[in-house]
Amino acid sequence: MGLDNGILIKTRQKLSPESLPLFVNIEMDEYKMADEGGGYWYEVCYWRKCWNIRNIILDIISSKENDDGIYALNKNDIRQLRYALNGYILNPYKWDDDYENGQTIWDSSVMLSHLIRDMANLAWLENYMDNHKVYVEFYDSY
């Protein structure tokens, strides 16, 4: 079973920590991607051994085509993911149920701050998509 999943964005303009709100915490090291269109790639969210989150995202994007485990996401997909993650934040016992059932190796005491950061990053991304041309993708290492 695979290990890693996440959300990457491609922007036309380079991001810097100074250009982001204080509550946003994304990976600022640019990813080197093999695409010919130029642009800058950044990782907005990353999950390791969180099969529960992977399953939620795959349910959201179930009808989409994929290219070797890469799925394009739109604003509605991001909104649905935020709603699902918020359920874990408001009810950590749901995360612990997933932990007990082998859907993740992390209990809620480890993941709660991570999920809150993900929510902030996704809220920023949803807003950023309103005013910027950005390509968003979910990668699935399975």
Task: Kindly give the residue locations of the regions a language model identified.
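Acidic (Asp/Glu-rich) sequence patches and key acidic residues
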Residues: 1-135, 139-142
